[in-house]
Amino acid sequence: MERLMIEPLTAEAFAPFGDLIDVLGPPDRLINAGLCGRHHDLARLDFDAEGRAGISLFDAQARTLPHVLDLVERHPLGSQAFLPLDGVPFLVCVAEDADGVPVRFRAFLTAPGQGVNILRNCWHGVLAPIGAPGRYAVVDRIGPGANLQEYPLPVPLLVEG
Amino acid sequence: MERLMIEPLTAEAFAPFGDLIDVLGPPDRLINAGLCGRHHDLARLDFDAEGRAGISLFDAQARTLPHVLDLVERHPLGSQAFLPLDGVPFLVCVAEDADGVPVRFRAFLTAPGQGVNILRNCWHGVLAPIGAPGRYAVVDRIGPGANLQEYPLPVPLLVEG
């Protein structure tokens, strides 16, 4: 099985695939009498005209490392953000697209409390909490129509830390 | 100072003011080869035509109980959801409206990992993490125009557990 090494998750490294949702610098502004910093509009949410943003909750079972990546999926009609409610780190596998085929895979692991937003139509592995089960708020598209494409990997990848 | 007692946070009790975002029953469907339950579209997101949903991050200082509630605010152009990334419970004070004046105050305290969505134009206290500072993903309205009304309480309330 081919190996895929986990690399450091930075906003720059992840930018082609989506957005890192975390405190990454000073706040855009202080609110609530200076007791709270607002880091404004951190994710490129993107939905088709028939869709809208919604908040759902994924209650996901634990996975372990090394992790066998045997399938990726994408959502042509909308972006998808994952926001951990239990502080459980999760694996984020993504890939570029070549005429409908995922290529040049990358793997990242969030730190506790970090969220990510995956761009509309970007190939990604399914939610994979590492080491413990976890609840995740998910901001994605609510609406009619087919918003899921799956691609089973002919040769699975072994994702390692 | 008048006292306001914290009451149990249930979806029913909070419904007039917003939505409780948590695992509250069986999932709407199982996804990811049965390894994840999806609890679908849990929040009444509501934005005016010029606004859209965005994900921001609030980095808020700790508060303590009892808590002095001396101001509430509301957002006429959009709902506002708070999703804890560090598992820090937070105080949720809300009130009904009587011709622009907040009345009949209520106070709730989330459990670790619970989020809430506050309905558009509903009076509420500012984000108040209890016992520790915390980061919260906030799904609220991004757009032009005035979306904040504040109401300083003539007589503050002492919120107690």
From Swiss-Prot, chains A, B:
**EC number from the UniProt entry:** 4.3.2.3
* Pfam families found in the cross-reference section: Ureidogly_lyase (PF04115)
What GO biological process terms does the UniProt entry carry, in alphabetical order? Answer: allantoin catabolic process; purine nucleobase catabolic process
The source's superkingdom equals Bacteria
The reply to whether Methyltransferase figures as a keyword in the UniProt entry is no
Catalytic function, reaction form: (S)-ureidoglycolate = urea + glyoxylate
MF-aspect GO terms? ureidoglycolate hydrolase activity; ureidoglycolate lyase activity
CDD domains noted in UniProt: cupin_UAH (cd20298)
State the SUPFAM superfamilies in the record.
RmlC-like cupins
InterPro entries from the UniProt entry: RmlC_Cupin_sf (IPR011051), UAH_cupin (IPR047233), Ureidogly_lyase (IPR007247), Ureidogly_lyase_bac (IPR023525), Ureidoglycolate_lyase_dom_sf (IPR024060)
The job of this chain, per UniProt, is described as: Catalyzes the catabolism of the allantoin degradation intermediate (S)-ureidoglycolate, generating urea and glyoxylate. Involved in the utilization of allantoin as nitrogen source.
Family the UniProt entry places it in: Belongs to the ureidoglycolate lyase family.
> Which PANTHER family does its entry note?
UREIDOGLYCOLATE HYDROLASE, UREIDOGLYCOLATE LYASE
Q: State the name under which the record lists this protein.
A: Ureidoglycolate lyase
Q: Which organism is it from?
A: Rhodobacter capsulatus (strain ATCC BAA-309 / NBRC 16581 / SB1003)
